[in-house]
């Protein structure tokens, strides 16, 4: 009887762990406008755990985001740089560690330098 209770508890823990892992899935869509939003954009997908998608540096990008997950949180400082029509811009939408992400970035604004590899595909 005790063995059966232990087995039931282990199965319940395994199912809870699988549900938690599924809930923390990380899938992002990154759109990059190298010459401003008036020009054409490049869009990549990025999945982490394992690294997947079309992002050109997906393995390094996943490693960076796992090491610094706070980089995807909303900026704590406002951007004081006026955008120009041709300023590089980027946007990230999707889910990171089970939480929704919907952010926009402009060159020189909070978040851009920390996420350069993620946003532009280049370090």
Region locations from a protein language model:
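N- and C-terminal low-complexity/disordered segments
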Residues: 2-123
């Amino acid at each position: 009887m005790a063995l059966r209770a232990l087995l039931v508890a282990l199965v319940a823990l395994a199912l809870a762990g699988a549900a938690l892992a599924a809930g923390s899935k990380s899938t992002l869509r990154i759109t990059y406008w190298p010459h401003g939003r008036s020009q054409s954009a490049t869009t990549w997908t990025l999945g982490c755990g394992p690294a997947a998608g079309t992002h050109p540096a997906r393995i390094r990008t996943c490693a960076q985001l796992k090491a610094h997950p706070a980089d995807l949180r909303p900026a704590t400082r406002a951007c004081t740089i006026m955008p120009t029509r041709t300023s590089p811009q980027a946007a990230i939408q999707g889910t990171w560690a089970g939480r929704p992400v919907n952010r926009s970035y402009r060159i020189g604004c909070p978040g851009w330098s920390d996420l350069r590899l993620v946003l532009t595909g280049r370090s």
